[in-house]
């Protein structure tokens, strides 16, 4: 297993106008992250990859393409979580066979699962695959909140490495870091990189890193070095960019920014809006000129 600390892009996926996977474009996005953004790794199959609108076979195809293009140049994490446990296991086995360094799985959602059911879900994926696991906690989308003691229960399984922490509860983040110093935490909110890094997170996984990965690393490393003033200046610029991206449409705007750099980033998958309006394309060009030139 490679070192899983550091800056990981939550990988975007390029789709054709008919919704099919654009393999050429996906390969270009992988290469852009490696060659231009200089990320430490990729988090494949997450929310940014429009994962929860895809079939099992499409998810496998994305895992295959990303691994084939990245090879062993960087670390790879496969997000295999699903409300269907058997699908999660099938995906986990496939990604493990491909050589992914660790699995990750979003907490099972929609139904109000009990904590014992959630623990069984993670333990089952690990037992079936033999791979490592990173809990993906994103309570504002799943409605699932896991407390400090419950994380301790999950961490009793030695294959659970830590958590992708996509939440604004920095008190919980600090408590987890103190209670379980040997387990890793990846910050999941790009706009809060500095405060997360100041609390000692081990890395970050972000959607905007596909185009803003260099600044993300600067914030992370400056904060680790105690250079908070310099880190804050870069966080301010980063958040100005993120504010513009969010106002314009998160995934489509990041894809447009990639297109402006020659990457065939494609469309989004319906029922999301497939492409930006001309006005929003023009705004993306303004963001590119102001923040990414």
UniProtKB/Swiss-Prot annotation:
Use in biotech reads: Although equilibrium favors sialic acid cleavage, this enzyme could be used for high-yield chemoenzymatic synthesis of structurally diverse sialic acids in the presence of excess pyruvate. Engineering these enzymes to synthesize structurally modified natural sialic acids and their non-natural derivatives holds promise in creating novel therapeutic agents.
Question: Which keywords does this chain's UniProt record carry?
Answer: Carbohydrate metabolism, Cytoplasm, Lyase, Schiff base
Reaction equations catalysed: aceneuramate = aldehydo-N-acetyl-D-mannosamine + pyruvate
A Pfam entry, by short name: DHDPS
- What effect on the protein does mutating residue 164 to A have, as reported in its record? Binds substrate but is unable to form a Schiff base
Task: Name the CDD domains on file.
Answer: NAL (cd00954)
Q: Which GO terms describe its biological process?
A: carbohydrate metabolic process; N-acetylneuraminate catabolic process
Pathways involved: Amino-sugar metabolism; N-acetylneuraminate degradation; D-fructose 6-phosphate from N-acetylneuraminate: step 1/5
GO molecular-function terms, A-Z: N-acetylneuraminate lyase activity
Looking up InterPro entries in the UniProt record yields: Aldolase_TIM, DapA-like, NanA, Schiff_base-form_aldolases_AS, Schiff_base-form_aldolases_CS
GO CC terms, sorted: cytosol
Q: What is its EC number?
A: 4.1.3.3
Q: Give the matching HAMAP family.
A: N_acetylneuram_lyase
- State its role: Catalyzes the reversible aldol cleavage of N-acetylneuraminic acid (sialic acid; Neu5Ac) to form pyruvate and N-acetylmannosamine (ManNAc) via a Schiff base intermediate.
Entries under NCBIfam families matching the protein: nanA, PRK04147.1
Q: Which family does it belong to?
A: Belongs to the DapA family. NanA subfamily.
User: This protein is called what?
Assistant: N-acetylneuraminate lyase
Instruction: Give the species this sequence originates from.
Output: Pasteurella multocida (strain Pm70)
**Phylogenetic classification of the source organism:** Bacteria, Pseudomonadati, Pseudomonadota, Gammaproteobacteria, Pasteurellales
Give me the gene this protein comes from.
nanA
């Amino acid at each position: 297993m490679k070192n899983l600390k550091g800056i990981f892009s939550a990988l975007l996926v390029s789709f054709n106008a008919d919704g099919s996977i654009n393999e050429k474009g996906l390969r270009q996005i992988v290469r852009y992250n490696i060659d231009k953004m200089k990320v430490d790794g990729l988090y494949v199959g997450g929310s940014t990859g429009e994962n929860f609108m895809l079939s099992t076979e499409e998810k496998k195809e994305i895992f295959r393409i990303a691994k084939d293009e990245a090879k062993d140049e960087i670390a790879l994490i496969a997000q295999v979580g699903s409300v269907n446990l058997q699908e999660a296991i099938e995906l986990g086995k496939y990604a493990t066979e491909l050589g992914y360094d660790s699995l990750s799985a979003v907490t099972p959602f929609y139904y109000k699962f009990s904590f014992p059911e959630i623990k069984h879900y993670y333990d089952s994926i690990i037992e079936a695959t033999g791979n490592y696991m990173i809990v993906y906690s994103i309570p504002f989308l799943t409605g699932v909140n896991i407390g400090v003691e419950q994380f301790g229960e999950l961490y009793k399984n030695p294959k659970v490495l830590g958590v992708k922490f996509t939440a604004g509860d920095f008190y919980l983040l600090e408590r987890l870091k103190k209670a379980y110093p040997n387990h890793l935490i990846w910050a999941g909110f790009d706009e809060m990189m500095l405060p997360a890094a100041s609390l000692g997170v081990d890395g970050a996984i972000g959607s905007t890193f596909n185009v803003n990965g260099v600044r993300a690393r600067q914030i992370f490393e400056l904060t680790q070095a105690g250079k908070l003033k310099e880190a804050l200046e870069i966080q301010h610029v980063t958040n100005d960019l993120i504010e513009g991206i969010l106002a314009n449409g998160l995934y489509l705007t990041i894809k447009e920014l990639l297109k402006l750099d020659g990457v065939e980033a494609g469309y989004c998958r319906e029922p999301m809006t497939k492409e930006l309006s001309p006005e929003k394309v023009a705004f993306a060009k303004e963001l590119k000129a102001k923040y990414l030139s």
